[in-house]
Amino acid sequence: MSNLAPEPEFQQAYNELVHSLRDQNSSRLPQILRLLCLSSPPERVIQFRVTWEDDKGNFQVNRGYRVQFNSALGPYKGGLRFHPTVNLSILKFLGFEQTFKNALTGLNMGGGKGGSDFDPKGKSDNEIRRFCYSFMRELSKHIGQFTDVPAGDIGVGGREIGYLFGAYESYKNQFEGVLTGKGITWGGSLIRPEATGYGLVYYVAHMISYASGGKETFAGKRVAISGSGNVAQYAALKVLELGGKVITLSDSKGALIATGEEGFNETDIELIAKLKLDRGYLTQLHAAEDSFKSRFKYLPGERPWCHVDKVDVALPSATQNEVSEQEAKELIASGCKFLAEGSNMGSTQEAINVYEEDRKSRKADGLWYGPAKAANCGGVAVSGLEMAQNSQRLTWTSEQVDKELAGIMERCFWNCLNPAKEYFDIAEGELPSLVAGANIAGYVKVVNAMKAQGDWW
């Protein structure tokens, strides 16, 4: 019996990796399979008390965390999350996934994740600023441009990054690239807000091209997207740019489903972006805008997956475990051929099993699954490019950053595809498993670096 506390989110991510490495032709993998016990514990876990003052002059206490998972490939890199559900299991899962995701980008970045159970919702700007300064008072002892470079995540946007960066500069008397996601006038990168959504669509574009032998693109594809935050918004805009049709968006209160052939347009996405900036919900937009009432149906409390008649591509972009086993079956029944995750661990393990079984049984006619650690690595890729710009004291153009992002996502696709073809027997007409390829590629790269640095022998 283990004496460790249960960590369900971390265990799910770990089990997925183990399944991929041991499932089929593990004899082709050398002794590194025995290193699962070495690669799963983080190098360091930092936990601390955050005491801050609210607007009434009362002190409040939250927990702060930083999980520095693996630095074999570079400085720890991964976001900070401020949300009441934050705990060590979630942060270990995210740091574990981040390690292999960062490896797939080809950039020199390790993996980490951090945050607090502080809830920024309902807090004033002054309360958030005071919390950020208190949080950074301890975190600043453990991070730096050559050590650990955090970024934003849920609950940590541009405002919070600004306060955290200001606190770090105040405590350390140093202006350095210690955080990414900064404002463009003080060390940030263009295309950073768009990066995860754009990168997701670039990745799926390569899936479509490979599966069709180069004959198909996004043009004319019906695309179901969940979420309506940054990832979903920019994924939708890039799909529209490439000629696809966006037929769903959602938030925590419900889903909008297109009732006709038109789907969402750029103006709709702009309205949704403004709504979300004001922390509103899609139900408000559907109730207030006649154009939304006439073209979309709103389903309170629902996710979109079981409510689309025909769909070609699904992009879960809201939160973890947002596609269940039954929803996976419904998507396949609706004709979905490609599913890639814009959200971290967007599908349950049961749903992933459904995807993979369909890929094997129906071969080229089945659903092809792109896992989060590969498909949504565009955000951290541009964070890596921001680090490069900070080191050079330069700011690249939007076109240059977007070109670099597109190249990284193409390399990431092939970094997943080629190991899947190398390590596993693939039946004639069957598409390679990208989830297995991603897990193997990231894992092998990390453990080989660990061996070169003397972590195992």
UniProtKB/Swiss-Prot annotation:
GO BP annotations, alphabetical order: glutamate biosynthetic process
Domain of life: Eukaryota
Keywords, sorted A to Z: NADP, Oxidoreductase
Protein name: NADP-specific glutamate dehydrogenase
Catalytic activities: L-glutamate + NADP(+) + H2O = 2-oxoglutarate + NH4(+) + NADPH + H(+)
GO MF terms held by the record: glutamate dehydrogenase (NADP+) activity
Subunit structure: Homohexamer.
One cellular component (GO) term of this entry: cytosol
Entry similarity comment: Belongs to the Glu/Leu/Phe/Val dehydrogenases family.
Disulfide bonds: none
Protein encoded by which gene: GDH
Enzyme Commission number(s) from the entry: 1.4.1.4
Pfam families, alphabetized: ELFV_dehydrog, ELFV_dehydrog_N
Top EC class for this record: oxidoreductase
Active site annotation, chain numbering: 113
